């Protein structure tokens, strides 16, 4: 591999802003903020808005959209135009 072309890949702690959940992983992201981890070492801290701990898809709090109502609304609005264009 070529030297000096790859970014610095190091341990980083990511923190979910809404839940406070933290996890240690590796990343090229950097930060001036640090946090002491469970192993006693200090790591850069990156605060993110959404993680799997707070995203509706992963928490099971997602909403099911009313697709039938949206299709009917589309048909009412554009249905006649499409039929006339085919003739």
From Swiss-Prot:
Keywords: Ribonucleoprotein, Ribosomal protein. Transmembrane segments: none annotated. It holds the Pfam family Ribosomal_L31. GO terms for biological process: translation. InterPro entries: Ribosomal_bL28/bL31-like_sf, Ribosomal_bL31, Ribosomal_bL31_B, Ribosomal_bL31_sf. PROSITE patterns: RIBOSOMAL_L31. It comes from the Bacteria. GO terms for molecular function: structural constituent of ribosome. GO terms for cellular component: ribonucleoprotein complex; ribosome. Belongs to the bacterial ribosomal protein bL31 family. Type B subfamily. Part of the 50S ribosomal subunit. PANTHER family: 50S RIBOSOMAL PROTEIN L31, CHLOROPLASTIC, LARGE RIBOSOMAL SUBUNIT PROTEIN BL31C. This is Large ribosomal subunit protein bL31B. It comes from Corynebacterium kroppenstedtii (strain DSM 44385 / JCM 11950 / CIP 105744 / CCUG 35717). The gene is rpmE2.
